[in-house]
A protein has these predicted regions:
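Short acidic, Pro/Gly- and aromatic-enriched capping/linker segments at domain boundaries
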Residues: 2-22, 287-306
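Aromatic-lined carbohydrate-binding/catalytic grooves of carbohydrate-active enzymes
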Residues: 343-385
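Terminal connector regions
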Residues: 30, 316, 320-349, 356
Length: 385
């Protein structure tokens, strides 16, 4: 069993076999828990502070499972980590697959559960090297084991396999991704066209407000807030890269959450191309925030085994929980710094970047004054006036 990872087994009130997996980063004061019911895809039932008794995740399944609603489907909507129509999901499609132009509606059955995750080696250091950061903490450059779970699920009839990864990183950042594989060869059917895979994190009932950013040149990252109502809100980016309107984070939290207060949950798609961030709530269940890569028709087509590229990896979807936006941001900063140990292993001068905010006469005394303060001047800071 991986460190800071626990597994529990039990049964639901209706006798369904349950398996719970609990991931925690005590130093970061965060934990995440999920429950498997039978061979169904898991559901995230906890994301927040560490639990005093992690085995209560089993009881959370019955506590959170929606009751059957009169006049509705036999199973009330309760999204798994990858909701499909097979589990009564009636929101926006999050899994879009086709063969020969015909839509597939897979029902995934879990075939394997493996605990453990791996944080890849850092970008600017040799594997196995260690260092001490500016706070005096000992760090390793990886790869390193982290709390995580890997779930493999299949629809044998449709010829589709999904491998889903969830990891909890040292700074408290959660991340998930999925790999979709075509199991059918050319003799068994057409190639598998992939239209969308959108992952997500569930929200508690208390999360009733959304924060994103919008903007344009000279007014980038302008915050905008709105209630999380029944329906779907999304921020697509189709410029081939994040543009001035891009919302690097989509955050949902208790109404009025700020920088230092209020439980809030953020997601970020780790992708430089077309992508979408979304928040969605149905009448029968709590909200979901998530996102993924935006694909055009025919952009990703998977061949059969041994016939070419037969799998597709989604970008990482990062999730950050915190009491206020500062704690959320700190988890992202911790992760970014861990990727560049040499850059952050010693003190750095302040970077003063006034750019278009100030025009100075080209006098050396300005540069000399900033040099004495340890600042680094960005090119273009001192301009003729």
């Amino acid at each position: 069993m991986a460190e800071n990872t626990s597994t529990f087994t039990g049964a639901a009130a209706d006798g369904t076999a349950l398996t719970a997996v609990y991931l925690t980063q005590p130093a970061a004061n965060v934990a995440i828990g999920l429950v498997f019911a039978g061979s169904d895809l898991p559901r995230i039932v906890h994301w927040g502070r560490p639990l005093a008794k992690p085995d209560t995740l089993l009881a959370a399944y019955d506590a959170l499972k929606p009751q059957r609603v009169s006049g509705a489907l036999d199973d009330t909507v309760w999204p798994s980590i990858l909701p499909t129509q097979a589990e009564s999901w009636i929101g926006e499609q999050r899994v879009v697959l086709r063969r020969a132009g015909v839509e597939l509606f897979p029902k995934f059955t879990v075939t394997n559960i493996e605990t453990g995750g791996v944080l890849e080696a850092t970008l600017d250091a040799v594997s196995g090297e260690s260092y001490t950061d500016v706070a005096g903490h000992a760090r390793a450059t990886g790869p390193a084991r982290v709390p995580g779970v890997i779930v493999t699920a299949r629809d044998e009839e449709q010829g589709v396999e999904v491998e889903w990864h969830l990891e909890l990183l040292p700074g408290g950042l959660a991340r998930q991704k999925a790999t979709v594989t075509n199991l059918f060869g050319a003799d068994a059917g057409a190639q598998l066209e992939l239209g969308k895979i959108e992952l997500g994190f569930p929200l508690p009932e208390s999360a009733g407000e959304i924060l994103t950013t919008t903007g344009h040149h000279l007014r980038e990252r302008s915050p905008q807030r709105q209630p999380l109502t029944v329906g779907r809100f999304e921020k697509p980016q189709l410029a081939g890269r994040p543009d001035f309107d891009a919302s690097l984070l989509l955050t949902a939290g208790v109404p009025g959450f700020g920088f230092e207060h209020g439980d809030a949950y953020s997601v970020h798609v780790g992708w430089s191309g077309n992508s979408v961030l979304s928040a969605e709530r149905l009448p029968y269940t709590t909200g979901v925030i998530g996102g993924g890569e935006l694909l055009f028709g025919g952009e990703v087509t998977l061949a059969g085994p041994g016939e070419g590229q037969n799998s597709y990896d989604t970008p990482w979807l990062f999730g950050s929980y915190g009491d206020g936006l500062n704690e959320i941001a700190a988890r992202f900063h911790s992760y970014v710094r861990s990727l560049h140990p040499r850059l952050f292993s010693h003190g750095r001068p302040v970077i003063l970047n006034t750019w278009e905010a100030r025009v100075l006469r080209p006098q050396l005394r300005y540069a000399e004054g900033t040099r004495r303060q340890g600042r680094r001047l960005r090119r273009g800071t001192i301009r003729g006036g």
